[in-house]
Every structure is written in C-alpha cells, then in structure tokens.
From Swiss-Prot:
Matching PROSITE patterns: PIPK
Entry's Gene Ontology molecular function annotations: 1-phosphatidylinositol-4-phosphate 5-kinase activity; ATP binding
Underlying gene: Pip5k1b
Alphabetically ordered keywords of this record: ATP-binding, Cell membrane, Cytoplasm, Kinase, Lipid metabolism, Membrane, Nucleotide-binding, Phosphoprotein, Transferase
Location of region: Disordered: 1-21
Entry EC number(s): 2.7.1.68
Reactions that this protein is recorded to catalyse: a 1,2-diacyl-sn-glycero-3-phospho-(1D-myo-inositol 4-phosphate) + ATP = a 1,2-diacyl-sn-glycero-3-phospho-(1D-myo-inositol-4,5-bisphosphate) + ADP + H(+); 1-octadecanoyl-2-(5Z,8Z,11Z,14Z)-eicosatetraenoyl-sn-glycero-3-phospho-1D-myo-inositol 4-phosphate + ATP = 1-octadecanoyl-2-(5Z,8Z,11Z,14Z)-eicosatetraenoyl-sn-glycero-3-phospho-1D-myo-inositol 4,5-bisphosphate + ADP + H(+); 1-octadecanoyl-2-(9Z)-octadecenoyl-sn-glycero-3-phospho-1D-myo-inositol 4-phosphate + ATP = 1-octadecanoyl-2-(9Z)-octadecenoyl-sn-glycero-3-phospho-1D-myo-inositol 4,5-bisphosphate + ADP + H(+); 1-octadecanoyl-2-(9Z)-octadecenoyl-sn-glycero-3-phospho-1D-myo-inositol + ATP = 1-octadecanoyl-2-(9Z)-octadecenoyl-sn-glycero-3-phospho-1D-myo-inositol 5-phosphate + ADP + H(+)
Domain PIPK stretches: 25-395
Source organism, top-level taxon: Eukaryota
Name by which UniProt lists this protein: Phosphatidylinositol 4-phosphate 5-kinase type-1 beta
Modified residues (Phosphoserine): 445, 447-448
Amino acid sequence: MSSTAENGDAVPGKQNEEKTYKKTASSAIKGAIQLGIGYTVGNLTSKPERDVLMQDFYVVESVFLPSEGSNLTPAHHYPDFRFKTYAPLAFRYFRELFGIKPDDYLYSICSEPLIELSNPGASGSLFFLTSDDEFIIKTVQHKEAEFLQKLLPGYYMNLNQNPRTLLPKFYGLYCMQSGGINIRIVVMNNVLPRAMRMHLTYDLKGSTYKRRASRKEREKPNPTFKDLDFLQDMHEGLYFDTETYNALMKTLQRDCRVLESFKIMDYSLLLGIHILDHSLKDKEEEPLQNVPDAKRPGMQKVLYSTAMESIQGPGKSADGIIAENPDTMGGIPAKSHKGEKLLLFMGIIDILQSYRLMKKLEHSWKALVYDGDTVSVHRPSFYADRFLKFMNSRVFKKIQALKASPSKKRCNSIAALKATSQEIVSSISQEWKDEKRDLLTEGQSFSSLDEEALGSRHRPDLVPSTPSLFEAASLATTISSSSLYVGEHYPHDRTTLYSNSKGLPSSSTFTLEEGTIYLTAEPNTLDLQDDASVLDVYL
C-alpha cells in the first residue's frame, strides 16, 4: 500500500494489509485512477468551453494505457488497462459550478498518493481520500454507475436551480478495465474532513430494523454508529437556533423530494459530531497529524462544500461559536442535550439506489417477517417521509426561545394609556366610595340589592348603574378609538355582588392593550376601607 493515515473520522486500512477489489490490488486501482484522471482531465483542457447539450450526458471517451507507455500516455508499473471517462463535458461543467479548476482537480487527485479508508457499510466498496481532504473516490457497482448516467440530466437541472444541497456532489465518473474486469469509480465531495476530529459518527436512515453498529464496527478506533445507537446516545436530539434549524430542515425536505422524484431510496444521512468542549483536550494530548499546514481549513477550493454552506447560510448562533473557535471548517453549530457545544458535519450519501424489482422483493419478504414500517428498504415516497420525520422529531430540534418582548408600537400605546388609567382609577374609586356611603346612610334593603344582583346575573351584558364609570372611561378616547367590553359573571351566591353587609360592589379589572379597554368582574372580599385595592389595572 502506498500510503495510509489515521486521523479524525478517516479510518484507513491497516498498513500491512493489501485489500483487493474484484481480484485487483487496491494499490493498482489507486495508481490507475491517478494515471487515468491525469490524462483525461489534461486532455479535456484543450477542448473549448461551450454549453452542455443533451448528448453530452451519454458520451464515453476511452484511452488505452499500456505499462510500457505510448506516444500519448506515460509508462507505469501496473498491468495494462483501459480508462473510460463518462460524460466528460457534463462533469467539467459540474466542477466549474463548484469552483473547481482543472489544475486544482488534478493536484488534489494526482499530486500525492490516495489514502485508503475503511468501509463501514455492507456494499464492499473501496473508498479513497485525496491528501488535501477535498475528494472521496468510491468504487461502485455496474448498476449504480448506470443509474448515475441516467440521473445526470435531472441532476444537472437540480444543481442549476440550487447548488446549495446536502445531496452528494459528483465530480467525475470513470471505469478502469484490466484483464476482463471493470472497476467503476465516482469522485464525490468529502463530507467529513480529517482535519476536524469527529468524536461521534452516525449513519442514519430513519429505520430501526438492524440499525445498530456491529461488534466489529464498535471495535474500530473511529466507528460509525447507526440509528438505534443515536437514539441511545442522543435520546433528546441535537439543538439548533431557529434560523439554522429552519434552513437545515428546508434543505433536507427539498433534497428528499428530489430523491423521491427520481425514485431513489435507501439513502442515509452521514452525520459527524465534533464536540468543541473536547477539542482543547484533543489538541493538548494529540496534535493534528498528516494534514499539511497549507491545506488546513479555511483554504477550501470547492464551493458549497461545507455543511454550513449546504444549508443556505449561517444561523445566528454561528457567530458566537466561530468567535470562540475560528477553526470550524464550516461545521454547523449546535448543542447536545447536555449543553455541550457541537460542530456538525453532514451530507446525504448512498443515493445511487433505485427502487427496482430486487428492492421491491427485498422489502416484501422483510415486511412479512418484521414490521414493514421499520424496514430500511421501502418505496421512495414512504422512505422520504419516514426519513424526514425521523430527522425532524428525533435527531434535529429547535431551541425554544423565550417569549419575545412587546413590540415598540405596543409599548408606546400602553405607555400612552397609563396616565389615563390612573385618572380612571381615582375617579371610579371616589364614585364608588360616595355610592357606598349613600347606600349605607339611606338604609337600602338587602332584598332590593338581591334583586339587582339577580337581574345582573340573568343579564350579563348589564353593569350596575355607575354613570361616572363611563364618563371616566371616555377619557381613553383621546388616545385612540377605544371600545369598552363588559363581561360580568356573578356566581349563584347572592353575597357576591356586595361583600358581607357593607354594600361593597364587586371589584372590576381593566386590561389595557392596543387601545382597547376590557372590563371584567370578580368577587370582591375587600373591606370598605381598602380603597386603594378597589381597581386593578394590568398594563
């Protein structure tokens, strides 16, 4: 093996273990990839730029690279092979859309040996990472490569409409032929940068059937966990500020609808979690390895490649976290249920799955044995809905902000009413005091008072005769066109209208808001002498 490195979430193969894919050594595959891409991209620069046409999506270019070399190709120490490039002009457009220049693309892939990563999935694919952390190179099956070819026109249209997406960004599709074996590879964006240590990594589908990391996976230095592991570790989810949460969910919803329209399913959200509270300890204990300073974060060449760029702009809380730790590499700020500050890196992966006959059969027999709704293989529309529901309810949550303060307009209107309300209070207090004195001196009978109370109870729209109340309330009309709403609800107990035998009327409460006065009645148990508490004004 030419080179390996172990850092962050990148888990390379063991240095003394040579992997094979279709009976071909991984070192030979890596060498052929670099030679083939170096030749085809360099040859493409001589072709003039033009608009992409429909037939460009179906063009396949081929070149033969013998080990002894030719007048067009260099000599090499690998077996003879043929290198095919699919839709070269279309993929050149995709690279330009994301700001990838041909020289940068060649430098990233061909300047240094590729780094082989371990594969936590069940596909058996090989994964290679460029030394500058920019690109992932993955081997794909024939059906996946064929599906990507058919997907390209719609993929082109989607990227034109919205380059900010969590969907995989494909930069090239190639095929190496040697000894009757076809090895197809695709070049994609790297979701989890090695330069940022991932304390936790999850592969989430929204399914619970067999969605727990295996024992073998858990024994790895940097395992990739699954849905059930996430629900156990982060049972209360991950919290975002409102703006970031809305942008993230909007992006996920749009991406899932795009995948559903192409009848794609069985995709996952790859989620890397960097805990900022642990990063200082990590820096003290273990310095960053195998990532040259010139290629450290902040020098990304690819547009829309970071997680934060992919969800349509930063949230409000991003500034605070970036101020504390400027080396965020475009991670999305969040918090755990423990209050830990986090940076999240994410992207949708494994989208080259079409809901064809084999997938339908797979879901059918699994649904017979298990709960069909929990099986990861499902029809595209149901899969998208379940995926979004899981992300929205179990994984990503919005921090509930405190109730907003009143608007400036409301504050001004209340302040304006405050002075008038004081006049209403003093006027009504004095009138009621005089009325109570008159009632006691004139010896008004309790029977007549009961009749008055009874009448008010059957007619809740009526208020005991207090003319001065309306005269005082009319003062509020100088501020705005106020309305007086009256609602008196007397209990069946006759003593509620007057307290004890002193003839004290029930207290009234004014609620002042937006230029309107609401009058409600409550039983009063105050003494006659408590004039200051006769009227409560709530502002």
